[in-house]
Regions:
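N-terminal low-complexity, acidic/polar interaction/targeting segments
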Residues: 1-219
Length: 219
């Protein structure tokens, strides 16, 4: 088993991040502004994760100044999340931070090692299962077929109403994605039900991820 990684967590309801994507953030809460600055300084990864439930709700009817100077809702994070390193794009005059997280890998929480002012967890990488070598060629073929089916389905469902999306899917960069890359990077362009995306994130094979996507599109 690989060495545990210490990662700072940024729980965001309904946001599921996938490896190979970039997550833009507009950060205004004091604790998370501190987290961004600390992690950039210390070269610590930040995990962006969907949430299970609200632990403490935010105060209602806050002014912008109140929101900027007090912590908001606190959430219980999902156990599986994705993480990467942060780039600060801009810090505004009032202290807000525009940042991007370059998502690199999936992780599973082992234990919490800090809760205040922001959560830091010890985590283990979540890897795909290793297929039987004798089945590898047939699995890869099925995955390519599923990728083609999903692309065709998306063109029928969305393409006619969204020429920009149609051009993206038909473009050389999109067409060059292998099934594994496709099973993640699809969600840099499209957002589905967050719990479904969480199930895809937790799936431990490309085929399992593609099957969930295909079944969802065929409902």
């Amino acid at each position: 088993m690989s060495q545990p990684l210490e990662v700072a967590l940024f729980p965001i309801p309904s946001l599921v991040a996938f490896p190979g994507t970039i997550v833009p953030l507009h950060v205004f809460e004091p604790r998370y502004r501190q987290m961004i600055n600390d992690c950039v300084r210390d070269q610590r990864m930040i995990g962006v994760c969907h949430t299970r439930k609200v632990i403490r709700a935010a105060k209602a009817n806050q002014t912008q100044d109140e929101a900027m100077n007090s912590n908001q809702a606190t959430y219980q994070p999902q156990a599986v999340f994705s993480a990467g390193y942060c780039d600060i794009i801009e810090t505004t005059a009032d202290g807000r931070i525009m940042a991007e997280i370059r998502i690199e890998q999936r992780l599973r929480i082992v234990k919490e090692i800090q809760s205040i002012p922001y959560r830091i967890v010890s985590s283990q990488p979540l890897h795909d299962d290793v297929p039987d070598p004798s089945e590898l060629m047939s699995i890869e073929g099925r995955n390519r077929d599923l990728q083609l089916l999903i692309n065709s389905k998306l063109l029928v469902m969305i393409g006619a109403a969204n020429p920009e999306f149609e051009n993206l899917i038909n473009g050389s960069e999109w067409q060059s994605l292998n099934p594994d890359e496709f099973s993640y990077q699809l969600f840099e362009t499209l957002r589905f039900d967050p719990d479904m995306m969480q199930a895809i994130l937790e799936a431990c094979s490309t085929q399992a991820r593609l099957n969930i996507i295909w079944d969802y599109l065929c409902r």
